[in-house]
Amino acid sequence: IDNNGIMRYIDNVFDLQNYFKLKQIPYVMYNALPNTFNIKIKDFADIYKALDLKRFFKPQTSHYEFVISEKLISSKSDPHPSVKGHQEWTEQLKEFIDANNLRTI
């Protein structure tokens, strides 16, 4: 991801997080697709530090990376999650929500 894309991503997550908190909407975030970026850039690092990572499921990985590594894709020609890929990710996500009491703000 180029620097503009990285900044947009972090800014969007930050803005959405703040909106949910302001409106007292319980939320959990995760990456559907890989989002590797260099947070050594000061502007990125400053905003990244403001993210509430307690509400971010596996922030260093993505659903896509999980299904690829676990071979839970639809087919060799379609890397979308299989039914089992969705189910396993969902179970982990539910466990994360319950373990961290994230159903409320």
Language-model segments: residues:
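Alpha-helical cap/lid subdomain in secreted, periplasmic
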Residues: I1-I105
